[in-house]
Amino acid sequence: MYTVTSADGTKIAYDRYGEGPAVILVGGALGYRKFKVMEQIAAGLSEHCTVINYDRRGRGDSGPAGPASVEREVEDLAALIETVNGRASLWGYSSGSAVALRAAAAGLSVEKLALYEAPFKTDPDAKFPRDDYATRLELLIAADDRMGAAKHFLRNVGMPGTMVAVMSLVPMFKRFGANGHTLMFDYLALGDQNMHGSPLRAEEWASVSCPTLVVYGSKTYPSLKHASRSLADALPNATLRELPGQKHAVKPSAIVPVIGEFVAGATVVA
């Protein structure tokens, strides 16, 4: 494990793998770098890339989250990019895609963006998240109810209440639930203006000029397919790709070759 100090003094923990073009993995809501899937993706890419797999602030071995802020997460990525000679591609998973987008929009030295199923709510027929999601989430975080915040999140991605109750009994959920206080970072990165069933606006993303690959699974939720298409339409330099047979929980064996080819121009076998 390595650490780098972000602009506000927060220590950001990361693991480094391999040699080649640099790619930083930006995990989604509740995730952390030691989650098995993230480690498998990092290992799979390491044959052809220098891979940085990090704990977003407030998670895992990184320092405390502090008040939710897009700017702080962008600063964290800026510090990580400096560890790989000042330029890197970013791979974002789910809401991590929004963090990666904000970093590119802010002018960081981002070579390429590969984004998997950023969960913007662009479909007017989508039921989740509910319009009061952020308000309730803020209250739970203010009360330091991390598990409550995590359960609230799961209900607002469409998980039935009975399944949420069962999930909360699974030991692994405790690790995810411990990151419940960071969920507002994800929501702010997505942007409240992008979470109420309207198309994404091109002007919001006009400064994201780097080559961008927007990927979604053929078996994912219709709302995530809709969001991926809307994102590709809004970005100035994007390619849209459907990944056959994949759901939102993408398999490393399916996504690693896609990232490797896009970032490094290499044929990668996961």
Predicted features along the sequence, with ranges:
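Helix-rich cap/lid subdomain of alpha/beta-hydrolase
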Residues: 118, 122-177, 186-194
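Catalytic active-site module of serine/aspartate enzymes centered on a nucleophile-bearing elbow/loop
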Residues: 236-270
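Active-site loop/oxyanion-hole signature of alpha/beta-hydrolase fold enzymes
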Residues: 43, 52-89
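Conserved catalytic-core motifs of eukaryotic protein kinase domains, centered on the activation segment
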Residues: 35-37, 62-67, 125-126, 225-226
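Conserved hydrolase catalytic core segment
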Residues: 87-124
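Conserved HGGG/HGGXW glycine-rich cap/lid loop of the alpha/beta-hydrolase fold
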Residues: 3-63
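Short beta-to-alpha linker loops that shape the active-site pocket of alpha/beta-hydrolase fold enzymes
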Residues: 55-59, 119, 244-246
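Conserved serine/cysteine hydrolase catalytic core
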Residues: 175-233, 242, 250-252
